[in-house]
Amino acid sequence: MSKVLTSLPVGQRVGIAFSGGLDTSVAVAWMRENGAVPCTYTADIGQYDESDIASIPGRAEAYGAEISRLVDCREALVEEGLAALSCGAFHIRSGGRTYFNTTPLGRAVTATLLVRAMLADDVLIWGDGSTFKGNDIERFYRYGLLANPRLRIYKPWLDTAFVGELGGRKEMSEWLQERDLPYRDSAEKAYSTDANIWGATHEAKKLEHLDTGIEIVDPIMGVPFWDDSVEIATEDVTLSFVQGRPVAINGKEFDSPVDLVHEANAVGGRHGLGMSDQIENRIIEAKSRGIYEAPGMALLFIAYERLVNAIHNEDTIASYHNEGRRLGRLMYEGRWFDPQSLMLRESLQRWVGSAVTGEVTLRLRRGEDYSILDTTGPAFSYHPDKLSMERTEDAAFGPVDRIGQLTMRNLDIADSRAKLENYAQLGLVGQAQAELVGSLQSGGAEAIASVGTHEESDAGALDRAAMESGTD
């Protein structure tokens, strides 16, 4: 049976994720006028585009809300963001720039905590402002039902009665004015913005057109690094990590992780760090475009991955990137608390993040222009003496050892040569690649794998004996 209601549940409590903007203000007043009992829940997620969030519940009461609550989600959101950081749970990247999934992170925390708050008030119907074309409608649906399996969904924007009466911003404004209800109609912009403590998303309207660049965006978490008139001074910053968690910035520890993230945002924001322009695939596989800000996450991520590369081996790093990307997509789809995500999170945090302890010093300039000045830690796999070109005592291996290692490679090189000869016979190579690979005559593989003919040495006798009587 569908959990989605398409008409107003008259006489019942309906919880609304309330931002205080025009859309949700009208929704609350309209539901009250038409016989429902609206209850509003506002998430404090540290959003940088809201300067007076404490006043929002009071505004909701003016529109007829029976219950109006402010739910502090900041600590939970920071913790989930730090988990995503340690897992590298970011799948959207373009030209070396990363989108740090700040909106999906916010939705996971907001939906879960708001529905739990509604459940405590015995509010079992929930609505929000997401549209049917976007990602959020599915994210909120999934997280809402995980938090309250009895939850039903009512969205005024899916109700033909509401849309027919109040289909646009002009109609909404006039409707409130006719009833002498106050409202806060934000200035019309060339794009829409959604923000939380980890980042800001700018999308829609003019940004839907790919001939419009990042320069039309007015950053809310930092400076427009592309504007030459904005002075940006060079700054050195040291990030400290313990077991995959950032613990200090420039040697300063903070009373809470929330305070640390605020400081990271301030440092990164001063340089315009962490802004990116991305084309992505929505959950429904339609492509969309967004401009993103995440100065603090970008700053921490640079240092974190520097330490990951200094500490872990190649296969571990490959797994970190592969599984992190998969986890990022799952989060994007609203599956951050699904079993497959929990499995990946547990593995990445336990076996990758827990080993990441150290400090990285960066020199920040403008935008993504930075230098790494120093990298230190107690358990690096990076040991310069192992590969030093200078003469070293007690070296891990010597010239003769490398000759033996190269000889062992003859087996797979011979196999590759045999495949190339076969491909040449099939006409798959040696045509477009003729200048590079030349002609491939048969017999090359055998020549590579052959040991040649020479008098048997002691080593040869041992090898023959092992093959005759030993095991592999």
From Swiss-Prot:
- As recorded in UniProt, its EC number(s) are 6.3.4.5
Q: In which pathway does it act?
A: Amino-acid biosynthesis; L-arginine biosynthesis; L-arginine from L-ornithine and carbamoyl phosphate: step 2/3
Give its localization.
Cytoplasm
Q: Which annotated residues bind L-citrulline? A: 99, 135, 139, 192, 201, 203, 280
Residues annotated to bind ATP = 17-25, 43, 129, 131, 136, 194
Give me the ranges of the annotated region Disordered.
Answer: 453-472
This protein's superkingdom? Bacteria
Biological process according to GO: argininosuccinate metabolic process; L-arginine biosynthetic process; urea cycle
Enzyme's top EC category: ligase
GO-annotated molecular function: argininosuccinate synthase activity; ATP binding; protein homodimerization activity
Protein keywords: Amino-acid biosynthesis, Arginine biosynthesis, ATP-binding, Cytoplasm, Ligase, Nucleotide-binding
Give yes or no: UniProt keyword Metal-binding: no
The cross-references to PROSITE patterns, in alphabetical order and at most eight, read:
ARGININOSUCCIN_SYN_1 (PS00564), ARGININOSUCCIN_SYN_2 (PS00565)
CDD domains, per database record:
ASS
Give the CC-aspect GO terms.
cytoplasm
Q: Where does L-aspartate bind?
A: 131, 135-136
Signal sequence bounds: none
Q: Which reaction does it catalyse?
A: L-citrulline + L-aspartate + ATP = 2-(N(omega)-L-arginino)succinate + AMP + diphosphate + H(+)
Record's PANTHER family?
Answer: ARGININOSUCCINATE SYNTHASE (PTHR11587:SF2)
Instruction: Give the quaternary structure.
Output: Homotetramer.
Query: Which family is this protein grouped under?
Result: Belongs to the argininosuccinate synthase family. Type 2 subfamily.
In Swiss-Prot or TrEMBL terms, this protein is called Argininosuccinate synthase
Taxonomic lineage: Bacteria, Bacillati, Actinomycetota, Actinomycetes, Pseudonocardiales
**What is the name of the gene encoding this protein?**
argG
